[in-house]
Curated annotation (Swiss-Prot):
PTM entry text: Predicted to be exported by the Tat system. The position of the signal peptide cleavage has not been experimentally proven.
Protein name, per record: Periplasmic nitrate reductase
Subcellular location: Periplasm
SUPFAM superfamilies per the UniProt record, alphabetical: ADC-like, Formate dehydrogenase/DMSO reductase, domains 1-3
NCBIfam families to which the protein is assigned, alphabetical: NAPA (TIGR01706), PRK13532.1 (NF010055), TAT_signal_seq (TIGR01409)
InterPro entries documented for this protein: Asp_de-COase-like_dom_sf, CT_Nitrate-R-NapA-like, MoPterin_dinucl-bd_dom, Mopterin_OxRdtase, Mopterin_OxRdtase_4Fe-4S_dom, MopterinOxRdtase_cofactor_BS, Periplasm_NO3_reductase_lsu, Prok_molybdopt-oxidoreductase
Leading EC class: oxidoreductase
Gene that encodes it: napA
Record's signal peptide: 1-33
UniProt: Mo-bis(molybdopterin guanine dinucleotide) binding residues: 83, 150, 175, 179, 212-219, 243-247, 262-264, 372, 376, 482, 508-509, 531, 558, 718-727, 802, 819
HAMAP family recorded: Nitrate_reduct_NapA
Similarity field: Belongs to the prokaryotic molybdopterin-containing oxidoreductase family. NasA/NapA/NarB subfamily.
Amino acid sequence: MKLSRRDFMKANAAVAAAAAAGLTIPTVVQAAAGSADSIKWDKAPCRFCGTGCGVLVGTQNGRIVASQGDPEAAVNRGLSCIKGYFLPKIMYGKDRLNQPLLRMKDGQYHKEGEFTPVSWQQAFDIMAEKFKQALKEKGPEAVGMFGSGQWTVWEGYAAAKLLKAGLRSNNLDPNARHCMASAVVGFMRTFGMDEPMGCYDDIEQADAFVLWGSNMAEMHPILWSRITDRRLSNEKVNVSVLSTFEHRSFELADNGMVFTPQTDLAIMNYIANYIIQNNAVDQDFLNRHVNFRRGATDIGYGLRPTDPLEKAAKNPGSDASDPMSFEEYKAFVADYTLEKTAKMSGVPEDQLEALAKLYADPNIKVVSYWTMGFNQHTRGVWANNLCYNLHLLTGKISKPGCGPFSLTGQPSACGTAREVGTFAHRLPADMVVTNEKHRQTAEQKWQLPAGTIPAKVGLHAVAQDRALKDGTLNAYWVMCNNNMQAGPNINEDRMPGWRDARNFVVVSDPYPTVSALAADLILPTAMWVEKEGAYGNAERRTQFWRQQVKAPGEAKSDLWQLVEFSKRFTVEEVWPAELLAQKPEYRGKTLYDVLFANGEVNKYPLTEIPADQLNDEARDFGFYLQKGLFEEYAGFGRGHGHDLAPFDSYHQARGLRWPVVEGKETLWRYREGTDPYVKAGEEVRFYGKPDGKAVIFALPFEPAAESPDKEYDLWLSTGRVLEHWHTGSMTRRVPELHRAFPQAVVFIHPLDAKSRNLRRGEKVRVLSRRGELISTVETRGRNRPPRGLVYMPFFDAAQLVNNLTLDATDPLSKEVDFKKCAVKLEKV
């Protein structure tokens, strides 16, 4: 599309609107000055967070030269945050990788060799050799992959097919394990289905917003602009923010609360108690739509079995629960009184009571938002469940302006990591590998012999680190993430495992990240609009984009790498004789033939792609690969509450929210009149559960795995900042973003700094029981910790904060608690 006068006027009008929200929009005028007629524009979702903003991408002479917020995108309405403003520049870092690099010595692969350019043929030769060796010597459990919530939908789906069906290994896990796993398990326990029931439209209809461990002002700034607009345009709207430290979201808060780490569990039980004691329960809703259960307690911390904390746990890893009555639940939460909760949490009584009244008042529509503060938590699943309790008790759920909403941090943590089944325990559309019927469904759709997919849950992210160190996971492929920097406790398991001579580690990445430089083989990867893609955002909105430029040099998309690598294996090399006996026609065929040239994936011809439209993968393989993968995948969910629209619909729309039935998207799930799966007269049906009822869980406060003591006397919480995304592998290569926040700092209370004889701007050594780093003291600015807590972002590769963190996880979700460990400071 060409830049028109109408587009010019739209862009300038949007700038004025953005200024009021404290946001920026790159104007088309600046990007296209003097050459408007030669810029081609096309739509795409933003490459960064899970909000799913729509952008217009301007290309010229084979390069991205501009971007702007898409005025037709319902999510962001033409706005861009500061990261979105600079999207074009993430593609063109000076150190962009453009050919495979293998550690070599004397012309051969060597674990301690220097990175040396090789061809794709050579790269896949050594990869295939190492994967086949691991399979032959130890079987499918010796191979694995760590994927991403930044994969496109079809990349994640192809990875699931290759690992779980082809190589017969469930050792596939995404980096979304580190951010969204607790939300997944929380949804499944309470509702029997994953992902939020509401949508962003709730913002304009809610009377109150409660943020639980979510700094939306910096992490989801476009959504925050909509909340800000709602709050400032209606004086009756209330914003409450809960966190373990003050941050920018507190600036809008009517009720900002800083609580002692881990005590959010107690606060939610207090609110439930308040609702019951003040007769604010929607009893009719409970009777018709809710069951009560008491969950197992003292479930451990996901550490190695030899750890003293695991040995001491009475029910390590238990997801068990027993039925209970409403009266029994009432008695359970009665222990969480206002006085007790205020003392535990450090939040004043009047603020706690004001918060409870929002949920209890039947005339106030409440939306609860959370991200990592809940999920990265040793009781993260419980935290999710307890928040659902509040909405279920009051009936404030699945209707406009009311509901619990788990926000996501990656662009397709929902659409790819969760929906297509790239977790070690999952298959597409909420199915799981431990369920025989689910495995049979997948095997039938994938045309596999019965028994191909293993029933055993694979290794989750932290378990992969431990298995690498222990030498039981030997061939390992990391795609579209920087886990050596982003994962916990780098020194004890991950780095030793990656550098163990028994193991061969491959990293696919556009840049030489900390992870890439720790690998044995680096594969150069196409980015964003250098390929055709699809993401699924936090409100169940699936969005497509077309390839708009070519990748540099020999860089190839993750999809191409996965599908091309499958050609290196014959079925005889990876499947036992008893499987082949069921499908003798597969003898002599490759995994590519069985998985991707199977009559389904390859049935859409190249003629469906316009002749002038870039699509490198499709033309390399000779068919419309992306469409074939999507339509095969979509077959899992259609008719089962996960309905996706036909492939071609998404290239026309600015995204559609599933389930999409008869061309109509669903804004609010489980509610009669808005969800096609709820029949007339049912009012509400939580159809993920066999009886259609959600579950309220009785779950207590339990302490963190590690707390400050006499020696390590401070809490450490980690996270992000507005200017950088995750490990900074993209944003730190944008000069403007790097200058805005060039290095990580330690945010600390001024009195804590003073008592340690530390001054702002001085160097300080931060130490935990696992490692140390040197950083800079910051006593001012956007983040204001209380006494006893310090905060550090993890974007800085020169300050690996995850040298400090503990690899304790929620035992149910296996998600790491990056928010709570103990550290001490030493003056340098």
